[in-house]
C-alpha cells in the first residue's frame, strides 16, 4: 500500500455532534461529501488543501458549489482561511499513524546502517 493511501475511519464518526448535524441536514450525500473532502486532504502535504483545487472534486462528485460550501463552512468540521482548509480531526487521527510510520522508518534505517558497518 502506498504511504498516502490509508485513512482511519473511526466507527464513532457518526456520533460526533457536528457530523450528526451534517447528516440530519444534508443527509448521506453530505456525509459522503465530508468523507470525499477528508480523502482529498489525506493526500495533500500536511493535510492542508487548496480551496481553488476543489472545483475538480466538485465536478467528480457532481455537486453544486453551494452544497460543497455548506459542508465546508456550515458544520465546524473544517478550518478555512480563504485560500486553504484542513480538518483538525483528520490531523488528530493521523498523528498515531504517522508516529508509528516514523518509528518503522527509523528502525529500517538503523537496520540498514548496521548492515553497512
Residue ranges and their predicted role:
Residues 111-117:
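Charged, low-complexity alpha-helical linker segments
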Amino acid at each position: 500500500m502506498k504511504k498516502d493511501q490509508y485513512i482511519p475511519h473511526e466507527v464513532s464518526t457518526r456520533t460526533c455532534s457536528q457530523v450528526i448535524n451534517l447528516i440530519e441536514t444534508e443527509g448521506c450525500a453530505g456525509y459522503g461529501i465530508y468523507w470525499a473532502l477528508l480523502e482529498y486532504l489525506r493526500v495533500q502535504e500536511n493535510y492542508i488543501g487548496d480551496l481553488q483545487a476543489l472545483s475538480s472534486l466538485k465536478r467528480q462528485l457532481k455537486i453544486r458549489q453551494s452544497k460543497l460550501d455548506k459542508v465546508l463552512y456550515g458544520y465546524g468540521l473544517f478550518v478555512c482561511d480563504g485560500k486553504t482548509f484542513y480538518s483538525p480531526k483528520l490531523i488528530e487521527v493521523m498523528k498515531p499513524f504517522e508516529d508509528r510510520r516514523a518509528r518503522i522508518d527509523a528502525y529500517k534505517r538503523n537496520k540498514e546502517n548496521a548492515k553497512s558497518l
